[in-house]
From Swiss-Prot:
It is a multi-pass membrane protein. InterPro entries: DUF445. The lineage of its organism: Bacteria, Pseudomonadati, Pseudomonadota, Gammaproteobacteria, Enterobacterales. Keywords: Cell membrane, Membrane, Transmembrane, Transmembrane helix. GO terms for cellular component: plasma membrane. It is found in: Cell membrane. The chain crosses the membrane at residues 13-33, 42-62, 403-423. This is Uncharacterized protein YjiN.
Length: 426
């Protein structure tokens, strides 16, 4: 029901009781006085007094009552609007937003567990995914492709400029030499080469290259000699010789080729670290990347391809992005529930945030409440308050009428005690 209608109905009820009390009082004035008539008259009188007193109290809150002397104590809410705003802001600051109250609230409710329980529900995780997809969809519709492409290109170029290519390469190689991991890499390479040379296709390829070399460099001998037979047997000899060498390197941890590989690796690391020529080559590679048309065209097309893929995925019923977000949210919730230390850490961070933020935030909110109330029109504010709590205030008038009538009855009965029980009879 509309608040205005409820307020008017409550006012009519309170006024009706006042009019009934007044009418009853007037009627008793014209009736012959007796015990009952005088009693009804006393009840009506007291009811009118209670109704009028509470009417004045309620009306004085919102409007000025033009009664000499006491009129300056009426229209309490409009007159004290600014003070009400300041006191309301101060009340909220002291009772709800002080640091200790917020910390106690965090400790009492353990928000990390509440968050975990909420996210662990698949329906809630999917809801988060759906909302994020809507935000993402709106972002994709509003973005300027040309600007995004330029931004992406500048970001990649800046990242390339910041990379110390020679230093990073040296660091990576140096990390590979720890615990002889580079020798493990060499072992893997040797094993792959041995397996490759043992294949028939590899031997046929070597034989073909030998035959081609003979035909190219020694065409006369190639016509006289059985080139195919020579190629096949030479391929076998080459493969067996290389396999034997690789097998020796693989078995002998102190093989001279391993030492040569060590020296070459450490020499390359030293060059990457200290050789200006190597640094210049690295810078040249970076410049080439930034100026290469194919690379820059790829960067420009990357955003468009990503944007189209996202739009198609977002609009599909079985969106993979939505599913991933939902899974991530559910995993986050389940992790919070299962990990006591993580929850304690998160709650601790929230408490620290409350200590840092609460004073400034509460002061800001206090000023905001006070300034907002001060900016309101006094009469409009009074009407809004009356509209929201006026119905209950009208029942104060109703209760004043009823309580006044009851008090009038009690006082009348007390006044009749001497007549009912004369002292001379005792």
């Amino acid at each position: 029901m509309n608040k205005l209608i409820e307020l008017r109905r409550a006012k009519r009820l309170a006024l009706s009781l006042l009019l009934i009390a007044a009418a009853t009082f007037v009627v008793t004035l014209f009736l012959p006085p007796n015990f009952w008539v005088s009693g009804v008259k006393a009840i009506a009188e007291a009811a009118m007094v209670g109704a009028l007193a509470d009417w004045f109290a309620v009306v004085a809150l919102f409007r000025r009552v033009p009664i000499p002397i006491i009129s300056r104590h009426t229209a309490i809410i409009p007159r004290n609007k600014d003070r009400i705003g300041e006191n309301l802001g101060q009340f909220v600051q002291e009772k709800f937003l002080d640091t200790q109250s917020l910390v106690a609230l965090i400790r009492r409710h353990e928000p990390a567990l509440l968050i975990g329980n909420w996210f662990s529900q698949p329906e809630n995780a999917r809801r988060v995914g759906q909302h994020l997809l809507q935000i993402m969809s709106g972002f994709l519709e509003l973005t300027d492709d040309a600007r995004i492409q330029r931004l992406l290109k500048r970001a990649v170029h800046r990242a390339i400029d910041k990379v110390d290519l020679s230093g990073t390469s040296a660091l990576m190689l140096e990390s590979m030499t720890k615990n002889d991991r580079h020798q493990v890499l060499l072992d893997t390479l040797i094993a792959q080469l041995i397996a490759l040379l043992q294949r028939d296709k590899s031997r046929k390829f070597i034989a073909q290259q030998i035959v081609r070399w003979l035909e190219s460099e020694h065409p006369l001998k190639a016509k006289i000699l059985p080139t195919e037979w020579l190629g096949e047997h030479s391929a076998e000899l080459v493969s067996d010789a290389v396999n034997s060498l690789l097998d020796d390197i693989s078995r002998d941890r102190a093989h001279q080729i391993r030492h040569a590989f060590d020296r070459a690796t450490f020499a390359l690391i030293d060059k990457l670290k200290n050789d200006p020529e190597m640094a210049a080559r690295a810078d040249a590679v970076k410049s080439y990347l930034k100026e290469d048309e194919a690379f820059n065209r790829y960067l420009s097309e990357l955003w468009g391809d990503l944007r189209e893929w996202l739009k198609v995925d977002i609009n599909s019923e079985d969106s993979r992005v939505k599913e991933r977000i939902a899974r991530a949210g559910q995993w986050f919730g389940e992790t919070l529930i299962a990990d006591d230390a993580l929850r304690a850490s998160l709650n601790g961070h929230l408490e620290q945030a409350a200590h840092r933020v609460a004073p400034e935030f509460s002061a800001f909110l206090t000023r905001h409440i006070s300034d907002t109330v001060k900016s309101w029109d006094a009469r409009d504010m009074s009407r809004q308050i009356e509209l929201n709590i006026g119905k209950d205030l009208q029942f104060i008038r109703v209760n004043g009428t009823l309580v006044g009538g009851c008090i009038g009855l009690i006082l009348y009965l007390l006044s009749q005690l001497p007549a009912l029980f004369p002292l001379g009879n005792f």
